[in-house]
């Protein structure tokens, strides 16, 4: 059966339908609101277009989707499956489409730094990136049951092997900081971009990529390199990169053929969220528990009437 993908993770927010000539106040300005269109555009999905007339003229477009529809999927698209790829939305859809999926609604999510999305990114259950806790960035995640989870996720990683014992990885695909331990996957680029200090060791996946749920296994393919930096990332593999002695010493013991196991845990408001399949970041939150939040001053560009 042909499945229908609801692209990205944010467009499912519902809004109150405006009655003809209703009055709205937006950023202190009053508008007359008329509904120009309200029609079905896909399975379980309607498009609403509103016309706001006042001192300024505004046009509002939004979709409302019933995620319980059995042929609607929630899917994150990240460029050309590379964190640093800069593509338009039509290009992203073209590169990620196939005969089994038709993309019909979506929204541009997260903001980009030079190293890709700021927030945690999960695509088809594979971890593309985790956000540093210092960013205070929010994310919306979808689990296997198509339940949405909004907030500031805290992600931890347990790495184990018979050679190193148990270790705690700090992040995935972020620039390495001091006293750090980062996993770099091929979604980050061709190499880690790290400086010469530290230890790095490459591995390839045994049973798929770095999964957002469960344990992923990787096989070490080369001897650890010390004080070299910028190690090449194998296709379909990872590089373990550390520059603190308590991480470096165990990594230096790894041998070719050793198996390392990596298990992530996603925590939201102190509770573990299981079976995450998709996630994308953004800031700030604008709607929570059915209430519009007063967050338009948190980022300077939000005070304007248009992005």
Describe each region flagged by the PLM.
Residues 254-262:
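Loop/turn positions that initiate beta-strands
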Residues 265-278:
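Short, Lys/Arg- and Gly-enriched loop/turn segments at beta-strand edges
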Residues 1-22:
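Bacterial Sec-dependent N-terminal signal peptides
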Residues 238-253:
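Short alpha-helix capping/helix-loop boundary micro-motifs
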Residues 19-240:
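Zymogen propeptides
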Residues 276-301:
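Short peripheral tails and domain-boundary helices/loops at the edges of structured domains
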């Amino acid at each position: 059966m042909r499945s229908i993908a609801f692209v990205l993770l944010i467009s499912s927010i519902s809004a109150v339908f405006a009655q003809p000539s209703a009055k709205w106040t937006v950023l202190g300005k009053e508008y007359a609101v008329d509904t120009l269109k309200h029609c079905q555009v896909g399975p379980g999905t309607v498009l609403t277009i509103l016309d706001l007339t006042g001192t300024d003229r505004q046009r509002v477009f939004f979709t409302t989707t019933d995620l319980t529809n059995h042929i609607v999927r929630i899917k994150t698209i990240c460029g050309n499956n590379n964190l640093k790829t800069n593509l338009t939305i039509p290009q992203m859809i073209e590169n990620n489409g196939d005969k089994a999926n038709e993309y019909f609604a979506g929204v541009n999510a997260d903001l980009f730094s030079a190293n890709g999305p700021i927030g945690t990114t999960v695509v088809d259950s594979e971890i593309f990136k985790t956000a540093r806790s210092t960013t205070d960035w929010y994310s919306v995640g979808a689990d296997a049951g198509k339940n949405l989870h909004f907030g500031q996720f805290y992600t931890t990683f347990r790495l184990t092997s018979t050679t190193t014992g148990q270790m705690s990885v700090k992040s995935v695909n972020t620039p390495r900081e001091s006293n750090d331990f980062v996993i770099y996957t091929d979604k980050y680029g061709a190499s880690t971009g790290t400086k010469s200090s530290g230890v790095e060791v490459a591995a390839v996946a045994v049973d798929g990529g770095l999964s957002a749920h469960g344990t992923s296994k990787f096989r070490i393919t080369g001897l650890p390199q010390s004080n070299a930096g910028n190690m090449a990332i194998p296709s379909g593999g990872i590089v373990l990169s550390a520059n603190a002695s308590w991480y470096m010493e165990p990594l230096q013991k790894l041998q070719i053929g050793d198996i390392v196991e990596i298990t992530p845990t996603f925590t939201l408001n102190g509770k573990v969220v299981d079976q995450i399949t998709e996630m994308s970041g953004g800031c700030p939150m604008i709607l929570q528990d059915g209430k519009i939040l007063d967050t338009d001053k948190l980022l300077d560009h939000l005070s304007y009437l248009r992005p």
